[in-house]
Amino acid sequence: GEYIDSCEVAFKTFGELNKKKTNAILVCHALSGDQFCSEINPLTKKNGWWNILIGPGKVIDTNVFFVVCSNVLGGCMGSTGPSSINPKTKTNYGLKFPVITISDMVKVQEKLVSALGIKKLFAVIGGSMGGMQTLEWATRFSNKVNVAIPIATSYRHSAQNIAFHEIGRQAIMADPVWNKGNYY
């Protein structure tokens, strides 16, 4: 595979980390998500995508838990991705951005969690692609997770999933300004 020397990670936290650092929940977003899982997204001015679940007195109670949500590696909301400047070329990565995997995303999240001083997460939760990240956490870093809550996900795609995603890919490529993905 390819290697990125360093990367930026955009993230948000909600609630307070307790003194023992045992109340942290990592929320992993789906493909079209971002770090704004709760409260108002400052860019869209809309409620976070899981605002109904995360907050004071809600299912993931931020009066009890410290919630961390990062934009994944390769995302487009502040973490290093195709729109980022490649330090070697001083231009956007664009199509030259390395192919990344769920495992790569989770390795970056683990570095973030460690940088926050958290040795073991109370839980990791995510749906769809976020659920795949949750499963990766449960296998790769099982010693750093108490509870894994994968939602609407699988450890691999079915033929139907692959076909569905191909339809989406074809729709993007049919856009008149597609330019073979060369946006930069």
Question: Over which residues does each language-model region extend?
Answer:
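Ligand-binding pocket scaffold of soluble enzyme catalytic domains
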Residues: G1-Y184
